[in-house]
Amino acid sequence: MEVRTSFSKARRIPEAVSTLINEEFVVVHQQTEDSSGKDAKPQLKVFSNGDDQLEKAMEEILRDSEKDQNNSTALPEGSSDACSQASGLGSGGQTNQPSLQLVLDPSTTEVSARRSSSPSEPLEEDSVLFNKLTYLGSMKVSAPRNEPEALRAMANMKSSSQAPLSVTLYVPNVPEGSVRIIDQSSNVEIASFPIYKVLFCVRGQNGTSESDCFAFTESSCGTEEFQIHVFSCEIKEAVSRILYSFSTAFKRSSKQASDHVKDFVLHTPDSDVYTFSVSLEVKEDDGKGNFSPVPKDRDKLYFKLKQGIEKKVVITVQQLSNKELAIERCFGMLLSPGRNVKNSDMHLLDMESMGKSSDGKAYVITGIWNPNAPMFLVLNEETPKDKRVYMTVAVDMVVTEVVEPVRFLLETVVRVYPANERFWYFSRKTFTETFYMKLKQSEGKSHTSAGDPIYEVASLQRESAREEQLLSPTSGGGPVSSQEDEAEEESDNELSSGTGDVSKDCPEKILYSWGELLGRWHNNLVVRPNGLSTLVKRGVPEALRAEVWQLLAGCHDNEAMLDKYRILITMDSAQENVITRDIHRTFPAHDYFKDTEGDGQESLYKICKAYSVYDEDIGYCQGQSFLAAVLLLHMPEEQAFCVFVKIMYDYGLRDLYRNNFEDLHCKFFQLEKLMQEQLPDLYSHFSDLNLEAHMYASQWFLTLFTAKFPLCMVFHIIDLLLCEGMNIIFHVALALLKTSKEDLLQADFEGALKFFRVQLPKRYRAEENARRLMEQACNIKVPTKKLKKYEREYQTMRESQLQQEDPMDRYKFICL
């Protein structure tokens, strides 16, 4: 695979495009016979965690490459903002090294990057070039973003291709660039089309003959006719790198598209959309009677704050488009640590000033921020190394023509340093966000005293959210799903529970299969129909989960439990305070559970309270609220309670809480024995670190993975649990450990725990990644006989331990 690039800037592979989300880039040095240690070239080794390290490493490579003239190998991810050199990946090099290497050599790159001067040759744009590809052809498709249809087309093209062509694929680095397919033998262009016409990318599934293939669809003739182009790679591992280049191009293209959207809004005089630019600045007391703007990191643009120093927050609001709206005043400025903050958690700042700017074009609000106040403790403690925290600031603006105050809310990243810290290198660039406000005529009061119409806010959207919509396949804007910003990708912030949207779209063929199966099932509710397990393993369609989950749990005839629930919610519970505390921390990232005393929290409270009264032995235990919340997202609270009780009793979840968690510890023992058998190297590494299963898997078992993982993954796990039983937890746990093995083998004790807590859940925000994980989990063998054997071993071990303990403890164990 030869790869050449005229320029590119390394970025993380988006989750929705590439499956190699565990890749991370670190620099390693390799000694050669001709070079000393100090002249050795850095190389690029692929793993997973940080653009900063990558860019610094790449800059070092570019500097060193000017001194060294050896032949080189290359990876598509080059990095240099101003560099016009290119890199080539040859077939040479040591075949026994698993790591990918990148060495840029001027003697070869200048030739490969040089633009063609021959009129007979196509002009090379700023592109990444991929050789050793075979073009299997193209065909028309009716659903350009349908993965099953794309995979079928890929399989058909792979099996029926009679005369595949060796081609070079050009993927542009610029938003106005074009994807080009060139015949290698004749250098003739086979096809060319702008990058924005590419709608969807897909790779062949592992374990199939198409595992070395990839394909993309493009709109060839307007919006009603689409083509899919299919390729195979001589080097299978190159598929992910090709998709990486596409994802980078999509990012740039979508950015340009969002600019076009903004231009359209700006130039539509009759539009009901009003555009605002809102900027944020934080100032600190400089000790000389003045307040100076705090510095921002040059690369990531996070604010650098100092501990204990009085601050001022300055927000500037400027209208950019449409008829000018009259801002009367700022109703309030609010601030809080964190992001996705509930309204009740925002704190009002004292206002120092508000009014129009000196040029009259903007409205400026200044608030006084005392960082020593208890509610701002998180923003006044020194931030640990390599970690940042979020801060949310909002202003409520009173606009003459709008009925209610308009809230502009900004979320940014900060780091807190000691009060005596000095900053040498920083950026003065302003933190700015663009908002699009859509108004509609008010049905109440129709005009102001001046005769202007009165409006209501129909929607208020940030530009960053618009860009995510442009990238979302469900919105028709592009080939990759919504991405968290780079700061979130690299931060140490844990993923909020309840994160992620789950699409209700489902191919007609799958819905037909489920419809036929449900028809048979309703004819005989006592017996599960044939083919059920196969369909469930692929995931129950979101639109059908309420019905299917109740059928799987056996809640089709549960009038007695429904009546009992209505009585239980009227009874008092001794655990009401604990329940109230927990529901505020359950799925804060989900709109349904965000608001204090909202419908979501109210229903969740009633289910947890009812169960605490119903189950007198166990009552309510911390973590149960997450499972109840998952059920509430699919069905009314009465039905959710019935399914919840079934899972606790019939599926045995409540057993994990009994007898001082004895059964839970047995599960940990079984998991470690399975690791010892299936992942011996990881088991040995954990043993060396004294890292035990209870340290990372407690939440997996007690909450059924519902507490920290994205909803697309959580819902699929509940599908499998209700169909296959509690043992599915072992399947999912082993799949997580297998897919993360390389990262965990390199981690120390603290690093491994942090990986389980922070990085691991973030990997499955994309539905495709979660689907692949569930597919792997279903393929893992966990024999019931083996689990029974491990359970007996655990009982024997516990009996031996108790022989050494107090006789009363031993008696209690025997009575379990």
From Swiss-Prot:
Q: Is Protein transport set as a keyword in this record? A: yes
Q: InterPro entries in the record, alphabetically?
A: Kinesin-like (IPR022164), PH-like_dom_sf (IPR011993), PTB/PI_dom (IPR006020), Rab-GAP-TBC_dom (IPR000195), Rab-GAP_TBC_sf (IPR035969), Rab_GAP_TBC_domain (IPR050302)
Entry protein name: Rab GTPase-activating protein 1-like
Compositional bias (Acidic residues) at which positions?
483-493
GO molecular function per UniProt = GTPase activator activity; small GTPase binding
What PROSITE patterns does UniProt report for this protein, alphabetically?
A: PID, TBC_RABGAP
Asked if the record carries the keyword Hydrolase, the reply is no
Q: Bias category Polar residues: which stretches?
A: 81-100
Q: Name one GO cellular component term.
A: early endosome
Q: Which Gene3D superfamilies match?
A: Pleckstrin-homology domain (PH domain)/Phosphotyrosine-binding domain (PTB), putative rabgap domain of human tbc1 domain family member 14 like domains, Ypt/Rab-GAP domain of gyp1p, domain 1, Ypt/Rab-GAP domain of gyp1p, domain 3
Q: Which residues form the PID domain?
A: 125-281
What is the role of this chain? GTP-hydrolysis activating protein (GAP) for small GTPase RAB22A, converting active RAB22A-GTP to the inactive form RAB22A-GDP. Plays a role in endocytosis and intracellular protein transport. Recruited by ANK2 to phosphatidylinositol 3-phosphate (PI3P)-positive early endosomes, where it inactivates RAB22A, and promotes polarized trafficking to the leading edge of the migrating cells. Part of the ANK2/RABGAP1L complex which is required for the polarized recycling of fibronectin receptor ITGA5 ITGB1 to the plasma membrane that enables continuous directional cell migration.
**Which residues does the annotation list for site: Glutamine finger?**
Q622
The domain comment in this protein's record states: The arginine and glutamine fingers are critical for the GTPase-activating mechanism, they pull out Rab's 'switch 2' glutamine and insert in Rab's active site.
The record's PANTHER family line, in alphabetical order, gives: RAB GTPASE-ACTIVATING PROTEIN 1-LIKE (PTHR47219:SF7)
Which UniProt keywords are present, listed alphabetically? Answer: Endocytosis, Endosome, Golgi apparatus, GTPase activation, Protein transport, Transport
Q: Which organism is it from?
A: Gallus gallus (Chicken)
